[in-house]
A protein has these predicted regions:
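Polytopic transmembrane helical bundles with strong interfacial aromatic enrichment
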Residues: 1-241
Length: 241
């Protein structure tokens, strides 16, 4: 486990798993798509338009989870000064931004037949949009500061301060009178049909595995860039790996 949190150890270990992770994510997503669009029954209230939730909810959950994990790694980086914690946080940001955008984009397609408009300044939608801006701000700051050490510290502040927005997104439908529907899955059970629940959870697993794979790919690329003067990286370059 300690080797996993060193640049060389992670680079070598993660390289073996990326293809398998992408493959597993593709299989899970394909099965979830089939179940969601061809097997799950038509909803009595929303008709077929509800099927977008399998993408919308999965991406929204992942956008929040990724940001929380980024904040944890950012805090760990400031406390321990571990290189890999900063790399993990930065490597997750593009996927988190993609998930936040996908949640908003797919939600607009669901909102048109349900609310009569693609967008409303609802508390949950607005806080999710703010989450996307946090991701974009993190990425912009990471690119704007040439010294990656200074960039990591500045971005860590954004990640840690911005994490307060995550519970706002989650509890917005309880704290305010919003158009967005409440949670269909709670600690007391689920209000949707079992086949819909299983399909949604499978899509979440697919997005979760994809996020792992994408983070691994970016982290390995960042390691090569930051550790390019190390002998083990130069040896890899000579070997064509």
């Amino acid at each position: 486990m300690n080797a996993f949190f060193t640049p060389e150890g992670f680079y070598r270990t993660a390289g073996y798993s990326v293809k398998w992770l992408y493959g597993l994510a593709a299989v899970c997503a394909a099965v979830a798509f089939y179940l969601g669009f061809f097997v799950c029954p038509i909803d009595a209230t929303q008709g077929n338009s509800y099927r977008i939730i399998f993408i919308h909810v999965a991406s929204a959950w992942m956008s929040m989870l990724i940001y929380v994990v980024m904040a944890v790694f950012s805090a760990a980086a400031l406390v321990t000064n571990n290189k890999m914690c900063s790399i993990f946080s930065a490597a997750m940001a593009p996927t988190g931004a993609l998930m936040a955008f996908l949640a908003l984009f797919s939600g607009s397609f669901w909102g048109r037949p349900t609310w009569g408009t693609h967008w409303v300044w609802d508390a949950r939608l607005t806080s999710e949009l703010f989450l996307l801006f946090l991701y974009l701000g993190f990425l912009a700051l990471q690119s704007a500061i040439a010294d990656h050490r200074r960039a990591d510290k500045a971005c860590a502040v954004i990640a840690i301060v911005g994490v307060v927005n995550v519970p706002i997104i989650y509890f917005s439908v309880k704290w305010w009178n919003t158009l967005h529907q409440g949670a269909s899955i709670t600690s007391k059970g689920s209000s949707i049909a079992p086949i819909m629940l299983y399909t949604l959870l499978l899509m979440v697993v697919a997005f979760w595995i994809y996020s792992f794979a994408s983070t691994f790919v970016r982290a390995r690329s960042m390691i090569l860039e930051r550790e390019r003067r190390q002998t083990w990286v130069q040896a890899l370059v000579k070997e064509g790996k």
